[in-house]
UniProtKB/Swiss-Prot annotation:
Residues 19-353 are extracellular. It is a single-pass type I membrane protein. The gene is Siglec12. Phosphorylation of Tyr-432 is required for binding to PTPN6 and PTPN11. Phosphorylation of Tyr-455 is involved in binding to PTPN6. Tyr-432 needs to be phosphorylated prior to Tyr-455. This is Sialic acid-binding Ig-like lectin 12.
Length: 467
């Protein structure tokens, strides 16, 4: 019986020696591995082997595995990864390539970290145990390195509220245990922030304002091992209450618009139509509604709640129209008064305006002319008054007795000196005299003649000569 077992064992060894090495030494590994630059990858691998001779190895012999890059000189120990403590990997791959599997358990899995573009190439596995040394050249692994396209992830609340602080987290879910942690940086258009970095993530605290709505915020991650960077950009949605509520008015078919303020008053002519557009700045958009006095109005178009079209039939009574903007964070309203006026009223108002303007202009012109005349008169010097004798100026004597004629002889009293002749070069002027008669005495009924003669006083008022 013992002899039979020995014969079977010898026959089995001879059978193994005669087999194809590919049937004795097998390896299962991915033939092509694609990985992005700066990242890491785990390549699963397992192998099998058999004894060719009884003296190849013993159960106590350790099992060593080696990963080589094709084209390297194995005689110079150019190993990329091994579990043999005596032999070390080359400097370029040290602390980046690891034989993660246990060859004792037929595990040859390879772990690669911080992959660089120059790592691309062909790799094969080598087994050493006792006298058995075998290179699995039939089962090579091709490593392809591409550009880094992975981006970080940003976690944030669905909506940010203006004036309230919020936390945002930037992380790299493809973290695979780098020798140095990644470097995080934040950039934003106008937002102010404070960040706190941890291994594999960064927490950002921001207090957004309404002007930050719609702006970009970027988280950038730099991998120190390869110095490659990747970034993620988001658009901020900041919730804020309504502001800058305005009403734009279009009169009739006119394309010219007018922006009205709260409390504005607008006269409306007879037969006129209006289009009122209410708008505000808020996020999410505020609910807009119109009311007339205390009556809520239906919007002209459901798709445009801020649009209100008013036709002459609506405007004949006028009134106060109010636009209300309602929002979860606050509300605003704006009111305007529409005053209908007939065409006659408008014409009278315009005529009154024109007449008033004309009268004002005429009064102003009259005052200006008068001031100019007075100013011109004051500038000319006054000439001395000269009286020229009138050709009909005679010595006159008036008798108190009407029955007695006046005598015009040389014995009469001379005229006052004011009647003296003026120089011939002076222009002749007209003088006026005032005749004053004394109270007449009663007539002598007895025919006696009064020997006393009464004369009248002739007064010439002195006139200033015209220049």
């Amino acid at each position: 019986m013992l002899l039979l077992l020995l014969l079977l064992l010898l026959w089995g060894i001879k059978g193994v020696e005669g087999q194809n090495p590919q049937e004795v030494f097998t390896l299962n590994v991915e033939r092509k591995v694609v990985v992005q630059e700066g990242l890491c990858v785990l390549v699963p691998c397992n192998f099998s082997y058999l004894k060719k001779r009884l003296t190849d190895w013993t159960d106590s012999d350790p099992v060593h595995g080696f990963w080589y890059r094709e084209g390297t000189d194995r005689r110079k120990d150019s190993i990329v990864a091994t579990n043999n403590p005596i032999r070390k990997a080359v400097k370029e791959t040290r602390n980046r390539f690891f034989l993660l599997g246990d060859p004792w358990r037929n595990d040859c899995s390879l772990n690669i970290r911080e992959i660089r573009k120059k790592d691309a190439g062909l790799y094969f596995f080598r087994l050493e145990r006792g006298k058995t040394k075998y290179n699995y050249m039939w089962d090579k692994m091709t490593l392809v390195v591409t550009a880094l396209t992975n981006t970080p992830q940003i976690l944030l609340p669905e909506t940010l509220e203006a004036g309230h602080p919020s936390n945002l987290t930037c992380s790299v879910p493809w973290d695979c245990g780098w020798t140095a942690p990644p470097i995080f940086s934040w950039t934003g258009t106008s937002v102010s922030f404070l960040s706190t970095n941890t291994t594999g993530s960064s927490v950002l605290t921001i207090t957004p304002q309404p002007q930050d709505h719609g702006t970009n915020l970027t988280c950038q991650v730099t991998l120190p091992g390869t110095n490659v960077s990747t970034r993620m950009t988001i658009r901020l949605n900041v919730s804020y209450a309504p502001k800058n509520l305005t009403v734009t008015i279009y009169q009739g078919a006119d394309s010219v618009s007018t922006i009205l303020k709260n409390g504005s008053s607008l006269p409306i002519s007879e037969g006129q139509s209006l289009r009122l557009i209410c708008s505000t700045d808020s996020y999410p958009p505020a609910n807009l509604s119109w009311s007339w006095d205390n009556l809520t109005l239906c919007p002209s178009k459901l798709s445009k709640p801020g649009l209100l079209e008013l036709f002459p039939v609506h405007l004949k009574h006028g009134g106060v129209y109010t636009c209300q903007a309602q929002h979860a964070l606050g509300s605003q309203h704006i009111s305007l008064s529409l005053s209908p006026q007939s065409s006659a009223t408008l014409s009278e108002m315009m005529m009154g305006t024109f007449v008033g303007s004309g009268v004002t202009a005429l009064l102003f012109l009259s005052v200006c002319i008068l001031l100019l005349a007075v100013r011109s008169y004051r500038r000319k010097p006054a000439r001395p008054a000269v009286v020229a004798p009138h050709p009909d100026a005679l010595k006159v004597s008036v008798s108190q007795n009407p029955l007695v004629e006046s005598q015009a002889d040389d014995s009469s009293e001379p005229l006052p000196s004011i009647l003296e002749a003026a120089p011939s070069s002076t222009e002749e002027e007209i003088h006026y005299a005032t005749l004053s008669f004394h109270e007449m005495k009663p007539m002598n009924l007895w025919g006696q003649q009064d020997t006393t003669t009464e004369y009248s006083e002739i007064k010439f008022p002195q006139r200033t000569a015209w220049p």
